[in-house]
Amino acid sequence: MLKRDVEKEINEWISNDNRALLIDGARQVGKTFIIRQCLENSEYTFIEFNLIENEKVADILRNANDVDDLILKLSLATEKKIVPNKTIFFFDEIQVYKDILTSIKFLVDDGRFKYILSGSLLGVEICGLKSAPVGYLKTIRMYPLSFTEFLQLFNIQDEIIDTLRDAYTNQKEVDSYIHERMMNLFNLYMIIGGMPAAVDAYLKTNNIDDVIDIHKSIVEQYKVDFTKYESEDKKLIISNIYDLIPAELNNSNKRFNIADINKNLRYEKISDSFVWLYKAGVALPAFNVTEPKSPLKLNEKSSLMKVFLSDIGILTTLYGKNCKLMILNNDKDINAGSIYENVVAQELTNKGIDLYYYNSKKYGEIDFLFEDEKGVVLLEIKSGKAYQRHSAINNIKEIYKAKAVVFSKENVSFENDILYLPLYMLMFVEKENECSIDLNINKFKF
C-alpha cells in the first residue's frame, strides 16, 4: 500500500491534537484518499460528507442554530452512529461552503467530536474569510507524490535507500550500477510525475499515452477553476500566466517575463493573479533576492520570480510526447534545463523549503537559494556534461561563505568546496531545523 509523507502528521493529529484539521492542496493530489486511509486505520468511527455530492449537508452547516442543532441534523443525515469522543467528522469539498471555517471555533470548543476538512482552492478561498479561526485549526498542504513516495512503487529495498543516504551524508560515490538504476527511475518520475491518477494509470497499463491523457484532463480541470475568479479580465490573465509557464522556463534566465502576457502590463497590477496560482497549488514560485545573504526573506524582490508547475509530469506532457521519449532515452540533445529546475523546485517545495534565486551582472546567476541551519545554500542545476562549470557559484560562495551544491546526472563528488550530487539525492535534502531559543527571563535580569 502506497504511503504518503503526510500520513505521519495526520496520525499525530488524530492521536494528540484537539484542533480541527484542514488538508489543503491542488486538485487530484490524493487528499481524500489519504484522509480516508488514515481514518480507517484509526480507533475512531468517521463520518464523511462530500459537500458537492450532498448539498443538504452544506445547507445544514449553513443554517444550524448552534452546535447541538448541527450535531442533531448531521446525525439524521448519516446511517452511522455518532458517539462523543469516538467520532471524527470528515467534510470534503468544503470550498462549496468555505464559511464552515469561521464556525470551526465553536465546534472545537464544544469538544465532543473531532473535525477534518478538505477541498480544492482552499488557499484561495480562505483569503476571503471575514474571520479565520486562529488557534483552532491545524493546516497541512499536500503536493503531488515526491520522488521518495514514487520510489515505493518499485520495491526499492531499504538497504539501497540506506546506502544512498550514507553516500549523501558522507559524500561518497555511489556504486555505478545503483547510480544508473536510480537515474533511470528519476527520469521515469520526470515523465510520469506525482499526480496519483497518472501514476496509477502507468502502473495499470505501462502506456504513456494514458498518463498524458490524465495530465491533459487535470490541466483542463485547472482551467475550469481559473474561470471561478471574480473578474473576467483576471480570469484571462490567470489562464495566460499558467499557459506561459512552460515557455517562460525556457528563457535563458528562466525568469517569468510579464511583458509576454501584455507589454503594457506591470507586475503590481497583476500580482494577485500570480498569488492565486500559488495559493491554488498549481504553480510554485522562486523569488529573486538582491543579495545571497541570510535571512533571504529580507532580500526578497517579489516582482521578479521564476514560476514552475506543481507537477513535473504535467510539464513534460505540455512539452510534448517526444520530450518524454528523449528523457527516457537519456538523449544528449534534449534541452533539459527547465525540466531539471522544475523538478528541483517541486521536490524542495514539497519539503516545505522556500525557494529563491539570485542574478547579478557582476557575479552571474544562482539557480536556487535556500537556508539550512548553517546559513545560505547555493544550488546550481546542470543538465549536461559541463556540470563543473559554474562561475557564479565560484564567485559567490567565497564572498558570502555559503555552502555550494550542484545537482546533475553525475555521481557524488566533492571538489573545491563544492558538493556534486545526482538529482535523485534531492530526496535527502531537509528543511532548516527550527532553532530552540532559551528565553528564560532570569537571563535578562541585572
PLM region descriptions:
Residues M1-S15:
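Pre-Walker A adenine-sensing motif
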Residues K114-S120, R141:
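Structural recognition of the conserved hydrophobic beta-strand(s) that form the central parallel beta-sheet
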